[in-house]
Amino acid sequence: MNMTTYNLTHLKQLEAESIHIIREVAAEFDNPVMLYSIGKDSAVMLHLALKAFYPGKPPFPLLHVDTTWKFRDMISFRDHVAEKFGLDLIVHINEEGVKQGVGPFTHGSAKHTDIMKTQSLKQALNKYKFDAAFGGARRDEEKSRAKERVYSFRDEHHRWDPKNQRPELWNIYNGKVNKGESIRVFPLSNWTELDIWQYIYLENIDIVPLYYAAVRPVVERDGTLIMVDDDRMPLKEGEKPMMKSVRFRTLGCYPLTGAIESEANTLPDIIQEMLLATSSERQGRVIDHDSAGSMEQKKREGYF
């Protein structure tokens, strides 16, 4: 009997692993959801989900936790993607936070993130009773994410205890949870930032235009270039936006996301820039610098 063997490239191996994880969760859990933050990792994760269930649609909705401070380009891209693929998109906003006027300028990055992202996410998970939530986090991004399992177990309050996680042997995942508990699932755990960009290029995946370099209005604060995306951003005395060619390596709330000066306006240019980069993509995320161990503390409280 002749048997055909296949030598998969490392990207195809990562793709196969991620699709396996997505299908496992769809089969094991009653009410899964895919967190869609509109960034490059979300774009790849959604692409993998579409592949996993082609020609059908993914058997779970997308959930976007809208802080009301995302870049305008992100919101228009989100709506375009949902319409293009006919996806079930849930947009959740913490209305109590909106009533209180919570924002990054008035309440600071830590409180804004807690109320409009962490608490809002937990509200949505409780409201729709999701028992598994896909996220696009990768282990190479940040040290607390480096020690997180693919199946990351959360208690009834959505809190993460890094000392109380289950072993994962090879590709065997234990999805049993008690009533009220849930898991966060990270199909891209073993991908790197470079893998993401190479896959986007090879698969021709649409991404938010903010990832490409263009001349944009920015101000420099504490060594970080912040894009002036709308008229809600208060300018300091004597501060004037500068027009610079910039792009973003990571996306979030616009007042809390730093741009980098760049001329890379094509995917090959971005990949070339990535190969020469010596800093983390999250260097521009203000929320990661709120305090030492900031990301781990947020995850313990229920953040993704």
From Swiss-Prot:
Family statement drawn from the similarity comment of this UniProt entry: Belongs to the PAPS reductase family. CysD subfamily.
User: Would I find Calcium among this entry's keywords?
Assistant: no
InterPro entries (UniProt xref): PAPS_reduct_dom, Rossmann-like_a/b/a_fold, SO4_adenylTrfase_ssu, Sulfate_adenylyltrnsfr_sub2
Name a GO molecular-function annotation.
ATP binding
- What does the record give as its pathway? Sulfur metabolism; hydrogen sulfide biosynthesis; sulfite from sulfate: step 1/3
Name of this chain's protein = Sulfate adenylyltransferase subunit 2 2
Q: Domain of life here?
A: Bacteria
Q: What's the stated role of this polypeptide?
A: With CysN forms the ATP sulfurylase (ATPS) that catalyzes the adenylation of sulfate producing adenosine 5'-phosphosulfate (APS) and diphosphate, the first enzymatic step in sulfur assimilation pathway. APS synthesis involves the formation of a high-energy phosphoric-sulfuric acid anhydride bond driven by GTP hydrolysis by CysN coupled to ATP hydrolysis by CysD.
